[in-house]
């Protein structure tokens, strides 16, 4: 009985400490928010503060903001005096120091957040992205951005379409990301010229669209053999214009893929076996290996349907004059 009483007291003391620590944490967050100068409640209010260059971004309490989509876009579809149409005009602000301190814990939409922000390169590695579901075009055409993002929680993100498209300087590890809920990776690294990181551990089992994913990713040459692509339906131009990519893909389950048009178009280094692929559902293979200068693999075992478009499939490749013979083709 004496020992049971001691155990209860110890347990009670532990619970008190836990509750005390939680209370202090909540209190510190509350106090830190109150110490900030500005407390916008909507995206529009936040944008007004951003446009005032005398305001230090680190003084803004963003804890109430749920939508940061197109945050730094001032105008869309503007026509100037000469009749020139500008699709997007970004903020005039040039100093973004303090943005790394923002509380993004309630943000669900970050679509186009840094779109066309040519000079932006601030450290935002500490951002809480645990509620974000949309990262479409988040760093698209952010020419200078090259900061660590590997510790971000992206577990609720459903679409990363165009996320790093045209982010010509970005080359940071992303191997820790949990992309298990993502369904769309179209153009994700298109024209991300320097990106060459190992993302073979990604769970891409829910992704349906990988079209243009590495299109023009000139430096990319990392293994992808562990990817589960069994849900993917579109691989159009996936590795087009990849100058260095030459990795094993034969283990991929491509049985649901319908579109492989220009998939390896001008993938000038690629020469890996693909004989195990089940391409029975593919409708379009036009120019699939066109100008793939080194591709010289046996594809005779493929079951290509008669209605499948194979126009110029091997044009400019070593197989141009000895195309595989498939039934019905």
Language model region names:
Residues 24-31:
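Hydrophobic h-region of N-terminal signal peptides that target proteins for export
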Residues 16-22:
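Sec-dependent signal peptide recognition
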